[in-house]
């Protein structure tokens, strides 16, 4: 089995399990980036608790789903965002979110992975990784 983009696999797995009304999703392979993205989603209230399981190969993450994700997915190619672009809400953010009050763009910054709203508050730029609403 080939895993080209672990973040895309994780977000697709969460979305598919939410659409099937499952209470739990198993994500593999696990990575630090996926764990940090899950922390942002947990902080924003989209997923519940998650746990890393070391299986001796890639590792797995079990995520408790709350039924609050309508759509999530990766943003490819990964667009660089400046601080001013996060405030101005450019076209590609409008493309991924239904409105500027609903949903988040997950951004990787120099201070770590966070939502685009938090990055704009901290006046940071970064790279857009994915979206959730």
From Swiss-Prot:
Keywords from the named record: Ribonucleoprotein, Ribosomal protein, RNA-binding, rRNA-binding
One Pfam family cited in the UniProt record for this chain: Ribosomal_S8
Gene Ontology, cellular component aspect: ribonucleoprotein complex; ribosome
Protein name, entry field: Small ribosomal subunit protein uS8
Family: Belongs to the universal ribosomal protein uS8 family.
Natural source organism: Saccharolobus islandicus (strain L.S.2.15 / Lassen #1)
Biological process according to GO: translation
NCBIfam families listed in its UniProt record: PRK04034.1 (NF003115)
Parts of the chain that traverse the membrane: none
InterPro entries on file: Ribosomal_uS8 (IPR000630), Ribosomal_uS8_CS (IPR047863), Ribosomal_uS8_sf (IPR035987)
Designated gene of the protein: rps8
Keyword NAD found: no
Role this protein plays: One of the primary rRNA binding proteins, it binds directly to 16S rRNA central domain where it helps coordinate assembly of the platform of the 30S subunit.
GO MF annotations, alphabetized: rRNA binding; structural constituent of ribosome
Domain of life: Archaea
Subunit note: Part of the 30S ribosomal subunit.
